[in-house]
């Protein structure tokens, strides 16, 4: 982790002299980080689902499809076409807010295993990297708005004392939303990174 922060610091110092090269390197680190988090989210969700009875899975999936994730309050592209039309800075800004929205909820995902305990620190590393990318890709026409004032509603009553059935639902919801959001961030960062390679085909 120290090596990652050192590299991020070095790259941030060189942004003004070699913006394209530095952005490429930062993007590679960020994409690698979010890919790891997305795979981890998929595994945690799969493990949780496998511990449920078939009827429990069916009911929870039905409820989740009718519910909303906390991050749905963050405006993002509605489909792959809008994603491809979005600017690099817009994709980075949305990714930053999505990652930031998990800083507190991720604590409830930690504990019990080494992979779970990696979630919060890796989210913090990813947020730092995306912030450096935003700084490197800002221009006078398009500026990143600070999201520090952005307040999202909590995940229902997830943090309260719940009955067994409700606790099961909240755990399912949290893991499903985390997987969904990490998939979004991976998609946005991958498309944004591709934009820096004019010869590349960025079709989703």
Curated annotation (Swiss-Prot):
Keywords: Disulfide bond, Hormone, Metal-binding, Pyrrolidone carboxylic acid, Secreted, Signal, Zinc. Belongs to the somatotropin/prolactin family. This is Somatotropin. Pfam families: Hormone_1. Disulfide bonds join 69-177, 194-202. Growth hormone plays an important role in growth control and is involved in the regulation of several anabolic processes. Implicated as an osmoregulatory substance important for seawater adaptation. One of its GO terms (molecular function) is growth hormone receptor binding. It comes from Thunnus thynnus. CDD domains: somatotropin_like. GO terms for cellular component: extracellular space. Zn(2+) binds at residues 36, 186. It is found in: Secreted. The lineage of its organism: Eukaryota, Metazoa, Chordata, Craniata, Vertebrata. InterPro entries: 4_helix_cytokine-like_core, Somatotropin, Somatotropin/Prolactin, Somatotropin_CS. One of its GO terms (biological process) is positive regulation of receptor signaling pathway via JAK-STAT. Its main location: secreted. Residues 1-17 form the signal peptide. The modification Pyrrolidone carboxylic acid is found at residue 18.
């Amino acid at each position: 982790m120290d090596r990652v922060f050192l590299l991020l610091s070095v790259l941030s110092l060189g942004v003004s002299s070699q913006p394209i090269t530095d952005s490429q390197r930062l993007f590679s680190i960020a994409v690698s980080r979010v890919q790891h988090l997305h795979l981890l989210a998929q595994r945690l969700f799969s493990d949780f689902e496998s511990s449920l009875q078939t009827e429990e899975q069916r009911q929870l999936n039905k409820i989740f499809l009718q519910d909303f994730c906390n991050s749905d309050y963050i405006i993002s592209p509605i489909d792959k076409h809008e994603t491809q039309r979005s600017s690099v800075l817009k994709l980075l800004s949305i990714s930053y807010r999505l990652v930031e929205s998990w800083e507190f909820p991720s604590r409830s995902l930690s504990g019990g295993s080494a992979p779970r305990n990696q979630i919060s620190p890796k989210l913090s590393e990813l947020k730092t990297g995306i912030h450096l990318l935003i700084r490197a890709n800002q221009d006078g026409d398009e500026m990143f708005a600070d999201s520090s004032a952005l307040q999202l509603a909590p995940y229902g009553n997830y943090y309260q004392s719940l009955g067994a059935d409700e606790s099961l639902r909240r755990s399912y919801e949290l893991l499903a939303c985390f997987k969904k959001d990490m998939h979004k961030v991976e998609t946005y960062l991958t498309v944004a990174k591709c934009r820096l390679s004019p010869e590349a085909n960025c079709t989703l």
